Amino acid sequence: MAQNNTPVRALVLAGGGARGSYQVGVWRALTELGWRPQIITGTSVGSLNGAMFALDLYETARDMWLTIRSQDVMELPAEDAPLSELHAFLKDAVTQGGMDVTPLEEIVERVLDEEKLRKSPIRLGLVTVEQKTLKARELPLEDIPEGKVKDYLLASAACFPALRAHTIDGVSYLDGGYRDNMPTALAQKMGAE
C-alpha cells in the first residue's frame, strides 16, 4: 500500500491498433474525474499511449489520434502509385519481414522524452516478446537500460508479420500482444492492488 494507506492504482492499456484512440477518450474521462494512476502498463499501442499519459501529453495524443493515417505509421506507396511500385513495396515487405515503420519511429522520437519519462511520478511498464524464443519480456521502465526506452516502446508495438520486428542490441522483438495483450500481471508485479 502507498504511504497514505490508499491502494496503488494502475491503468492497464491493451494493444490493438485503433483501440489506442479509445484509450485517449478513457484518459480524458479519468482526468475529468480526477483519477490518476501511480502505475501504467501497456502492450503495443497501449505502451505508446501509456508513455504519453505518464508525460501528461493529452493534447498531443488527442491531436495525433484525430489526424493519424496509415502512412503516418508505416511506409506505404502513394494511392496512385504504378503497379510496379506496388509490386516492389509488397516484395520488400515480404523479404524484409514486414513493413517499414520509420514514420512511427519518427513520431516516437519527436514526442517522447526519455529523461522526462524516467522522472515522471507515474511508473511505466511494457511488454514485448523475444522473436527467437517467443517469450514475453515484462519491463518496468526502471529495468530498461538508459537510452533504450524508445526502442522498447517500438518493440512492444512491432506487430509482426505486418510490421518488422524491432531489433535492440542484436535481439529481435515482437509486439507484446503475442503473449500478454492486457498486462495486468505486470501491473501487480509493479505494486498495483
Located regions from the model:
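Active-site-adjacent alpha/beta core region of enzyme catalytic domains
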Residues: 83-193
